[in-house]
Amino acid sequence: MTDTPPENEEQHESNVQNENEVEHLQQEIVTLKTELKEKNDKYLMALAESENSRKRLQKERQELMQYALENTLIDFLNPIESMEKALGFATQMSDDVKNWALGFNMILNQFKQIFEEKGIIEYSSIGQKFNPFLHEAVQTEETSEVPEGTILEEFAKGYKIGERPIRVAKVKVAKAPTPKENKE
């Protein structure tokens, strides 16, 4: 007879049941680890997305503030140039006018210093080659004294921040003389 005692059978069933439970728990651990990794990956992705959004919004805010500052400063360019022209005539006036002009020149220099501090620089165009990104041709003049496309005169100064123009210079540009026809 191969009957096993009831104690061994119970123990055997208990062992099988424990093994099944351990196996089930190990599978559950694997499943939970996988879920945890997925949730952690999603969290890290959301965190990175949030950080990128924060940086993008900060950059957009800085660009908007820079744009607003540029537009405000651009509005001062024409009055400043008018003041420069007026001060140019002051040298031909009386001593009293020259003293007033000296004070206005100091104010003008303060404006220019503010522009410089904000990165706005004026650029010279006379004698340069015409560049449509930096110049607006308002007149042309036929001449053979300089190469075609050379800027002869500047009617309004150009200004830029870094390499980006904020107001192009208005200029007169040289063009090649038109050939004259011989009439016989």
UniProtKB/Swiss-Prot annotation:
Biological process, per Gene Ontology: protein folding
Alphabetical UniProt keywords: Chaperone, Cytoplasm, Stress response
Annotated GO MF terms: adenyl-nucleotide exchange factor activity; protein homodimerization activity; protein-folding chaperone binding; unfolded protein binding
GO cellular component, one term: cytoplasm
SUPFAM superfamilies, per database record: Coiled-coil domain of nucleotide exchange factor GrpE, Head domain of nucleotide exchange factor GrpE
Localization, UniProt: Cytoplasm
Segments of this protein annotated with the region Disordered: 1-22
Quaternary structure annotation from Swiss-Prot or TrEMBL: Homodimer.
Family named by the database record: Belongs to the GrpE family.
Annotated protein name in UniProt: Protein GrpE
Origin species: Chlamydia pneumoniae (Chlamydophila pneumoniae)
Lineage start: Bacteria, Pseudomonadati, Chlamydiota, Chlamydiia, Chlamydiales
